[in-house]
């Protein structure tokens, strides 16, 4: 059994209500379970392959899920990258290997299923790209209309293409992501349209399965630290909740330090952590090459600050140049192709190791959130162009070896 509870004033709400924030104080909501009633079959947990719905007993859904086989993403042991950064043990959890190419699939399989369960037959979101792509695809699978609002000219074309091809109504607004989110929240409050941004607590329940899977894939041992990119701040919150729930249920016995990485041009959470402020100061004009985390007023900031502080973690910002260098390292040292925002985790890890904040003997998991093909234009912009040669073997040899045979 479960219900919703405000993290600010403690007001409680029925699971049958269509509600996104507290009606009394506008605080964020969390899904609260009766853990004493949840019985986990450890033998089944240890033998069944990871996927979102493997953990159905810890998800707030009663009906058949809308699924395209999300989850079960690889956890790569990255020895060459670890050596370059200077730590002993590094893993990369590559969420870009989900069906739509990002971690958002985990939230949307639960969120769209919940929409149907609540009798909502149209869904909507604002997006920097990945959310719109995932919602369009899960909406198509469910057979319901999808509306997405994007900041005009600020979204990678690979992500826009996904939303368009899968039939979403795509609106490019003259404004940034935060403007789009404010508008879609107003729309969903006035119409019978279900909001599936990460302010929706049910969506985050799907994303917490990343934490479940990491523990699962490490034989239920918890890493010392999770390092991940932070945009709207739902993922760092959700993953920490996943680890907390496994500990509550006695499946694991410790918690990782949650470490959030933001781009220098868009880092309100980093500034709040470093200053000790109880809340963020929104940034009006966030800018970074990492479009997926170009968010100046993250809606889950309160939850994220709590997760970082409670876990003994930290937050750090990185430059666009550091992000793009890490993107190349992931690809060229480990064969892991990610979009720029994903690489922020590795860029941040490198910086924090160099600063002495992260110990070289720590076991670290970096989350990479989206696939390389989400934003191919950035790759083309920062990599060397293909070498054009004549169609003969001597020209080929000269291009490769510097001389003809």
From Swiss-Prot:
Cofactor(s) recorded for this entry are: pyridoxal 5'-phosphate
Q: Which PROSITE patterns match?
A: DEHYDRATASE_SER_THR
Entry-annotated residues carrying N6-(pyridoxal phosphate)lysine: 104
Fetch the InterPro entries from UniProt.
Ser/Thr_Dehydratase, Ser/Thr_deHydtase_PyrdxlP-BS, Thr_synthase-like, Thr_Synthase_bac/arc, TrpB-like_PALP, TrpB-like_PALP_sf
GO molecular function ontology, one term from the record: threonine synthase activity
Gene3D superfamilies in alphabetical order = 3.40.50.1100
Q: In which pathway does it act?
A: Amino-acid biosynthesis; L-threonine biosynthesis; L-threonine from L-aspartate: step 5/5
Enzyme class, spelled out: lyase
Q: Which PANTHER family match?
A: L-THREONINE DEHYDRATASE CATABOLIC TDCB (PTHR48078:SF6), THREONINE DEHYDRATASE, MITOCHONDRIAL-RELATED (PTHR48078)
Q: Which family does it belong to?
A: Belongs to the threonine synthase family.
According to UniProt, the name of this protein is Threonine synthase
